[in-house]
Amino acid sequence: MSELKTVGLFALTALAEIAGCYLPYLWLREGKSVWLLIPGALSLIAFVWLLSLHPTAAGRVYAAYGGVYISMVILWLWTVNGIRPTTWDIVGSAIALLGMAIIMFAPRSA
């Protein structure tokens, strides 16, 4: 799988997980409709399915996915919650993405 497809799949996976957790949060903490649990559960099902599409060892996928997840949550904080990321949020996200790139794309012996 190409690097661009891998990162895109990680981003889509992260969005599914974030939405799957955020929708029940809205119900529990902000008094929104209980019906949000249905798309929340579907999002978590999609998250698990998307995570299974990555073509490398599960442990490596989970470790690398964490870097993309961090960056996607910071983006969610800004776009959905309306909270502008700090310089340190952005630096931390960049470091996490660098870690993801090293884990996923470093040369490996066959």
Swiss-Prot record:
Keywords: Cell inner membrane, Cell membrane, Membrane, Transmembrane, Transmembrane helix. It is found in: Cell inner membrane. It is a multi-pass membrane protein. The chain crosses the membrane at residues 7-27, 33-53, 63-83, 87-107. Its main location: membrane. InterPro entries: UPF0060. SUPFAM superfamilies: Multidrug resistance efflux transporter EmrE (SSF103481). The keyword Lyase does not apply. The keyword Transmembrane helix applies. One of its GO terms (cellular component) is plasma membrane. Belongs to the UPF0060 family. This is UPF0060 membrane protein Pcryo_1498. It comes from Psychrobacter cryohalolentis (strain ATCC BAA-1226 / DSM 17306 / VKM B-2378 / K5).
